[in-house]
């Protein structure tokens, strides 16, 4: 993001708890930016399943954990739309995978892709705020729905004219099954902007985003272009050359 800040004038020597002075008598309010991405997944086919991955430390007093550093993952299948509504959790290093259970990779696991969240935020406005009533996609970072060609926008078709949410909150209240279905991932991410003097008069670029990376989709690193060895012994150094 970049652009020009929305500013307000304040009396000399006056400060505000709701914004930053970025020049004499110029106040830039604190604010947030939120984005919602609709990702129509098709991982090795259209029938996919979503999983939430939480990391958990093992008990400190366990006999097998004498070095006190063991941890494991809990892989939770998300069966319905309401179950899939979740937020990031740093305490659990939470992530999500999306898999095709009918297609197996070289080690017999489902092929899939993994969501790697980037920088994010939660809304500080109350749920009573009008913008949140109209754009409830900010309530959760992750939503999953079955594909529906009429459900194209996280905040519904006409959010500026609505009296309540007509988007993701309404869609997911149906609580439809999302197991082995043609599913859509909706990812919400945001930035909390506390303006600084360096943002004036024109902001430098600020980035936000996420990554969707293969997770067991390929059998090895697909960028590895070294051919497999064909000789079984080290007797001949040039056996691969023909």
Predicted regions and their residues:
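Extended effector regions of multi-domain proteins
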Residues: 1-242
């Amino acid at each position: 993001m970049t652009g020009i800040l929305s500013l307000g004038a304040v009396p000399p020597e006056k400060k505000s708890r709701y914004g930053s002075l970025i020049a004499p008598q110029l106040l830039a309010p604190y604010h947030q930016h939120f984005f919602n991405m609709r990702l129509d997944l098709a991982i090795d086919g259209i029938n996919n399943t979503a999983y939430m991955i939480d990391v958990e430390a093992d008990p400190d007093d366990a006999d097998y954990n004498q070095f006190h550093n063991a941890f494991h993952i809990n892989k939770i299948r998300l069966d319905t739309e309401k179950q899939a509504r979740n937020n990031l959790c740093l305490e659990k290093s939470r992530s999500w995978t999306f898999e095709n259970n009918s297609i197996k990779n070289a080690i017999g696991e489902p092929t899939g892709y993994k969501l790697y969240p980037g920088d994010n935020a939660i809304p500080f406005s109350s749920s009573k705020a009008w913008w949140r009533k109209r754009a409830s996609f900010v309530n959760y970072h992750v939503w999953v729905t079955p594909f529906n060609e009429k459900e194209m926008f996280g905040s519904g078709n006409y959010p500026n004219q609505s009296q309540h949410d007509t988007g993701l909150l309404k869609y997911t209240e149906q609580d439809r099954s999302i197991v082995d279905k043609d599913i859509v991932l909706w990812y919400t991410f945001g930035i909390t902007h506390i303006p600084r003097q360096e943002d004036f008069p024109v902001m430098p670029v600020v980035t936000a985003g996420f990554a969707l990376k293969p997770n067991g989709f390929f059998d090895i690193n697909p960028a590895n272009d070294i051919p497999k060895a064909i000789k079984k012994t080290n007797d001949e150094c040039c056996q691969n050359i023909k």
